[in-house]
Amino acid sequence: MTQQRQMHLAGFFSAGNVTHAHGAWRHTDASNDFLSGKYYQHIARTLERGKFDLLFLPDGLAVEDSYGDNLDTGVGLGGQGAVALEPASVVATMAAVTEHLGLGATISATYYPPYHVARVFATLDQLSGGRVSWNVVTSLNDAEARNFGINQHLEHDARYDRADEFLEAVKKLWNSWDEDALVLDKAAGVFADPAKVHYVDHHGEWLNVRGPLQVPRSPQGEPVILQAGLSPRGRRFAGKWAEAVFSLAPNLEVMQATYQGIKAEVDAAGRDPDQTKIFTAVMPVLGESQAVAQERLEYLNSLVHPEVGLSTLSSHTGINLAAYPLDTPIKDILRDLQDRNVPTQLHMFAAATHSEELTLAEMGRRYGTNVGFVPQWAGTGEQIADELIRHFEGGAADGFIISPAFLPGSYDEFVDQVVPVLQDRGYFRTEYQGNTLRDHLGLRVPQLQGQPS
């Protein structure tokens, strides 16, 4: 009998006030204890209890102030990224109380040097026993650039060109220690074999790194590379490097097209498509009945202030939408931008979310509920499991990012009400079968790449 293909599950939430659901901090059941290490440890324990493959934390390097060029909305109303703790530090906190759960952190390949990034993730991978993933981003806008002493953010495709070289340099550093370089022969007084530790001497268009790294090779070979860029250039980057991809898609049809497109990019890059796992995000809202779950979803979305959504949308598109009255039709804003020849992603967002006929306020509220793309599913545990299985069998993804409606309770509900159904139906593990994140995802250990000594 053919063995049932297994679904992968990942948690995704900000180390701060909100993630996709911008009103989540106002939810009556939200603890808002996001400055406490115990808060993150509770979530990590919950996801490990549910046998999740991993969790990972996004990051942004600036408070959102594109909307109105001030902090009134982004901070005053609790916008996305108003509070954002450094993800790698939070991952270390969670690693200390878990044994199997994979742990991912986002660090920009644009604003940090490759030696620092390689060392951070190699350290986390050693301390966690090989459970770490790096979510590679190239950052978003000029606000982030200014926090690093740079006036203007690099152009989109140039950021990915630089990131290609950045990954090359980081991987060289991760490979600068052979598997058996650490000797620890007390009697002979030999700590390590210097012939098996290598300079990398990377000299490229963007970066220069000598090496070697000061951290021996990881228990899983290398940290898992995770990536979320879905632009054409981002997909090519994923095809070349990503071992897991985080996708945002509003419905099954778009999920299927995204899945097929990314797998094709992996194949075109000469890699095995089965060695890149694609996750798509969903936001389940659970209740003891469909009616109760729907009521809870409506309550969640009622907490979103339209200008909070517009603050994030302004940050994502680079357009100060506060320049327009809230009752302005989106189609009029798009026409104005086109007439002024202002390049923006707003056209793409509006088309993808069918928002052209909305007013600006309506668009803000919609964007603030789920950043426009994350499907919100209301139902019982059985119904949510049904939807996950339907999408999984329909070729939407290899697994799902579970975006929380509020924290920490959403994950407790999902683990208690949805995971057992998936397990009973044979779609999800009942126990971890390995120790590393690569074990969970079915990824091969990368072959050690030789370095010049």
Swiss-Prot record:
Induction: Expressed during growth on DBT or DMSO as sole sulfur source (at protein level). Part of the probable dszA-dszB-dszC operon. Desulfurization is repressed by sulfate, cysteine and methionine.
Gene Ontology terms describing biological process: dibenzothiophene catabolic process
Coiled-coil annotated residue ranges, if any: none
Chain residues that bind FMN: D59, T106, H156, Y160, S231
Annotated compartments: Cytoplasm
Pathway this chain belongs to: Sulfur metabolism; dibenzothiophene degradation
Reaction(s) the record says it catalyses: dibenzothiophene 5,5-dioxide + FMNH2 + NADH + O2 = 2'-hydroxybiphenyl-2-sulfinate + FMN + NAD(+) + H2O + H(+)
Other comment: Reduced flavin is provided by flavin reductase DszD.
Name assigned to this protein: Dibenzothiophene-sulfone monooxygenase
Source organism per UniProt: Rhodococcus qingshengii
